[in-house]
Regions:
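Single conserved hydrophobic/aromatic residue that forms the stacking wall/gate
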Residues: 1-9, 14
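Solvent-exposed loop and edge beta-strand segments that line ligand/cofactor-binding
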Residues: 5, 48-64, 117-129
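Long, well-ordered mid-to-C-terminal structural blocks that present hydrophobic/aromatic surfaces
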Residues: 11, 15-81
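Terminal, non-catalytic domain-edge segments
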Residues: 66-175
Length: 175
């Protein structure tokens, strides 16, 4: 997940800072991140959980970085509303941090995914790495009157689907 956001950021820097740099690479990377954001939003279960896979899982809510960045930049695809993304991300954050099992006695994040699980971290992971979880909080940089905060709350895709409500059909992505 962090590679998607890093690629878009790199392409944006190249586009903005290099004379005659083609905009097409940035646009392609941005569209791919938007598509990934749509998939990521669908991964969030009605209970606010998400699939546990990948070597970066100790970053916990850092997995929400692409959605957070899309919202912060105002790049959410038309298929995702601000209210929908806000409510889905909040559900994950509440589930992850609501019971304090992820913090040690001094209030610092522990190595693990949901609790102290140091065996799942890689040799290069340390307690500082865990603060990539804060990437989910990028929207906190948005003003209070931004649509991310003011749009009406909406159920996210999996919540609608499992609740028997109408929800958008997924589709193939073509460039």
């Amino acid at each position: 997940y962090e590679m998607t956001s890093s690629l878009v950021g790199s392409e944006m820097c190249i586009r903005d800072r290099i004379w005659n740099a083609p905009d097409c690479n940035f646009q392609r990377a941005q569209k791919r991140m938007q598509r990934f954001g749509m998939i990521l939003e669908r991964f969030i279960s009605p209970e606010g959980a998400f699939p546990v896979f990948g070597r970066s899982i100790t970053y916990r809510t850092g997995t929400l970085q692409p959605l957070a960045l899309l919202a912060w930049r105002g790049w959410l695809p038309k298929e995702l509303s601000n209210g929908q993304v806000r409510v889905a991300m909040t559900a994950v954050i509440n589930r992850m941090f609501g019971d304090n099992r992820n913090f040690n006695e001094k209030g610092f994040l522990t190595l693990g995914f949901n609790g102290s699980q140091p065996h799942i971290s890689d040799w290069y992971t340390n307690n500082g790495s865990l603060y990539m979880a804060s990437l989910a909080f990028l929207p906190l940089g948005l003003p209070a009157d931004h649509p991310f905060w003011t749009d009406a709350p909406q159920a996210w895709t999996s919540k609608k689907a499992w609740g028997g409500e109408e929800f958008p059909k997924d589709h193939a992505y073509y460039e």
